[in-house]
Amino acid sequence: MYLFVKSLLFIVFFILIFTFQKQAWPDHKRECKCLKRLQPRIPTDSVRLLTRTIFKLLSQTESDQEELYSIAEHQSHLADMSEEKKEGLGHLCTTLQVYLGEENGDLSQLPPGLDPISLLARVTCNCFSISDGELQDVGVGLYLSMSLLNHDCQPNCVMIFEGKRLTLRAVRLIRPCEELTISYTDILATSKERRSHLQKQYHFLCQCTRCTTEDKDCDMLAGEKMAWTSLRDVIPHLKQLQSEQRWEDLLKESQALLHRYTDVVPDRNIYVLRLLDLAMDASISLDDYKTALEYGNRALEPYKLYYSDPHPSRAVELLRVGKLQHYMGRLEEAQGSFTQAYDIMKVPHGTDHVLTNERPSTAVPPRPHTPLLRFFDMLAVNQHAMCLPPAFVPLCIKPAGLEFN
């Protein structure tokens, strides 16, 4: 399943596309009724996704039932959940019943063992955040085959989205019979934080090498403990400012904290690094590209330390810095940043991903998702004699990896 974001009645909701929009119309129409029924409240992502899953289950054809894996074969982990979490699921089920309204009677037609709370638990444990080429979340979805992959904090594969397609790509050599793994959590966190998140969300204790050896934890928590503890505690407030798009307040507070602790907590401390990212985002949103570039440059070395190549997060950070350098006319620096970003991206994204390969035919200013080769074209024009090395010639080959449509 894959989801796209659309709007109706000023509410954001997800529409599941099966093959063509015409085929999805019956479920689209049912969901419109549900959204109207719940106004002015907005259902959570998990309730919306569960509703789409229920519609899918109720309309299953025989060919659908022959799919490789079904939601019933995935773990719900209900027995492992705390009473508090079960109570939360119960509240969501109540919301679901109100949301479904007259459609609620159809729940009795669900396959055996798939009651609403069990389904909700399966959805929350097995769904993925859908991201764009620059790793910004744009939705949630169920990819049932992908959900069977286990976690490792140093995985041998990454997942890359391109529109409706999710591609699993190897990021290092994989030995015969070696298990394919992905990361369920952001690795920009200490071993304790990663383990806590994985235990709470997915109900297992991570025993990977990176967690058991506490690899890089000393760097992540470098500096005076009292200082970085203060930074850690204020970050949720700053993220709230970011979600509310209060950019001036976010930049002002982030800058004050970075200035206050600059001598006692280094940039490689993960809480300073998160501050740098927040300050960079605020500066870009306020069109203060000079300040944004300053923070972006400071973040490059810590990103290199924690996101070993070819990690897409480091490539995206290099891409952001390169764009800022390009905007400011620092073309040689931009060329270097784009070259590094491309060398990384061609592994996890592939050389035919839209972010690395597409060449728009019209001369337009660079947008947030302008493909890398487009930037190289513009740099070549601006510097008159700059030629692309052979590595940047677009290759019309299918990316290595397993694609799940």
Segments predicted by a language model, with ranges:
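Short alpha-helical interaction motifs and adjacent low-complexity tails used for partner binding
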Residues: 1-380, 392, 396-405
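Cationic, low-complexity basic patches in intrinsically disordered or flexible, solvent-exposed regions
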Residues: 384
